[in-house]
């Protein structure tokens, strides 16, 4: 392996941002791009009804509602590090897409609202990170408003999420008395002016807590800060990089993303401490990012990122080797060699053609319906990357057309949207209905909105008597045929042709499982 390849791998940081809705994740994303020089002015999310929307929220429905319902990928350069930032859906209904994004990152940044502490979505996402031992850095946001005491917030994180906290910055006051942060990582005090949308050219830095300027600037809060820091240096957990990388400890920063408080300090610590691209598991062996042979997997498909082009993009995580524009790779699921001529890198909706890319990078491959979530591409070895599941949906709707002449457009729209993983599509064995299944109900609104805006299809939903689904398998062909005959009314094929049992209740599901012990019912399914 060349020195240059190792250097390129080592300077990459690929991470996702996770939080409960409204903790300020989109604002923080904007500010990271601002400090990285990727944008000159933050998108002022509060002005979302005006013409300017947050850079990472580009779909029409997101701009109307002010929620992130798809995950964007953004690349920027900071202090000679190449950073790939994956912005995950902020609404609790989008946990499945968020999970898939977390399969493509090496670490995560958790955003917590200082007034609310740990909330339900944060807890769920943390469970996903735990399954993969993903290192987590924490940003406690909205210190410019009144909130919980900093020590109480740390205790809440430790108790609720069962992870040790190591504060690397400390707030000076909160709400109207918020003056800035003391950086324990660099032993520096940083004072900011509120309300800056553009990147500040310089910050006031005071390195000695006994500096008399501290009293001039902070007044009575100066002594409180000195007491806090003395207490922390004696009682708080010291930051241990190895424990962070194992997922046992989270370094914590305090700040106010909307006012640029504490964001750059966190970004500085992040690029120095966050992991380089990690090895990736396959069905046969672990793939090191330092290997020379090219490999990677598709973790997301997004239709119509550019409505003018009616395109579909497959988001692809490079796991090893170097990507070169125009290179020939093997698409293993379909057993074909393909040339990737026009791969793209992303800056939210802006894109650029990529000439070369390295492990940790996320590239976009144009997809005309042949690529699916979970697909593996390599230049040699037949590999299959693991850990990219679908979850059993909990909510269901039947789709009906207002105009029967639009049936082809409806079918095309539903198939493409199901391929994205935004919703699951089922076709019952005994009729021609389209049944949609989702992990959360907001997904149905998104699908209806996108059918109308992107496929010019007016449709309505009808309720159906389903409460849960399971993918079914049986090694005994005769038993499976008998099962299909007896349970036909509850059986459907999903978009990939997998047989699925749709149950009207958990009780009905349990009863059927007892009746058919040779049939296996799966709650999750790996993408083929």
Swiss-Prot record:
<keyword id="KW-0342">GTP-binding</keyword>
<dbReference type="InterPro" id="IPR005225">
    <property type="entry name" value="Small_GTP-bd"/>
</dbReference>
<dbReference type="InterPro" id="IPR035647">
    <property type="entry name" value="EFG_III/V"/>
</dbReference>
<dbReference type="GO" id="GO:0005525">
    <property type="term" value="F:GTP binding"/>
</dbReference>
<dbReference type="GO" id="GO:0006449">
    <property type="term" value="P:regulation of translational termination"/>
</dbReference>
<dbReference type="InterPro" id="IPR004548">
    <property type="entry name" value="PrfC"/>
</dbReference>
<dbReference type="InterPro" id="IPR038467">
    <property type="entry name" value="RF3_dom_3_sf"/>
</dbReference>
<dbReference type="InterPro" id="IPR031157">
    <property type="entry name" value="G_TR_CS"/>
</dbReference>
<dbReference type="Pfam" id="PF00009">
    <property type="entry name" value="GTP_EFTU"/>
</dbReference>
<dbReference type="GO" id="GO:0016149">
    <property type="term" value="F:translation release factor activity, codon specific"/>
</dbReference>
<keyword id="KW-0963">Cytoplasm</keyword>
<keyword id="KW-0547">Nucleotide-binding</keyword>
<feature type="domain" description="tr-type G">
    <location>
        <begin position="10"/>
        <end position="278"/>
    </location>
</feature>
<feature type="binding site">
    <location>
        <begin position="19"/>
        <end position="26"/>
    </location>
    <ligand>
        <name>GTP</name>
    </ligand>
</feature>
<dbReference type="InterPro" id="IPR053905">
    <property type="entry name" value="EF-G-like_DII"/>
</dbReference>
<dbReference type="InterPro" id="IPR027417">
    <property type="entry name" value="P-loop_NTPase"/>
</dbReference>
<protein>
    <recommendedName>
        <fullName>Peptide chain release factor 3</fullName>
    </recommendedName>
</protein>
<feature type="binding site">
    <location>
        <begin position="141"/>
        <end position="144"/>
    </location>
    <ligand>
        <name>GTP</name>
    </ligand>
</feature>
<dbReference type="GO" id="GO:0003924">
    <property type="term" value="F:GTPase activity"/>
</dbReference>
<dbReference type="InterPro" id="IPR000795">
    <property type="entry name" value="T_Tr_GTP-bd_dom"/>
</dbReference>
<dbReference type="GO" id="GO:0016150">
    <property type="term" value="F:translation release factor activity, codon nonspecific"/>
</dbReference>
<dbReference type="Pfam" id="PF16658">
    <property type="entry name" value="RF3_C"/>
</dbReference>
<dbReference type="GO" id="GO:0005829">
    <property type="term" value="C:cytosol"/>
</dbReference>
<feature type="binding site">
    <location>
        <begin position="87"/>
        <end position="91"/>
    </location>
    <ligand>
        <name>GTP</name>
    </ligand>
</feature>
<dbReference type="Pfam" id="PF22042">
    <property type="entry name" value="EF-G_D2"/>
</dbReference>
<comment type="similarity">
    <text>Belongs to the TRAFAC class translation factor GTPase superfamily. Classic translation factor GTPase family. PrfC subfamily.</text>
</comment>
<dbReference type="InterPro" id="IPR041732">
    <property type="entry name" value="RF3_GTP-bd"/>
</dbReference>
<dbReference type="InterPro" id="IPR032090">
    <property type="entry name" value="RF3_C"/>
</dbReference>
<comment type="function">
    <text>Increases the formation of ribosomal termination complexes and stimulates activities of RF-1 and RF-2. It binds guanine nucleotides and has strong preference for UGA stop codons. It may interact directly with the ribosome. The stimulation of RF-1 and RF-2 is significantly reduced by GTP and GDP, but not by GMP.</text>
</comment>
<keyword id="KW-0648">Protein biosynthesis</keyword>
<dbReference type="InterPro" id="IPR009000">
    <property type="entry name" value="Transl_B-barrel_sf"/>
</dbReference>
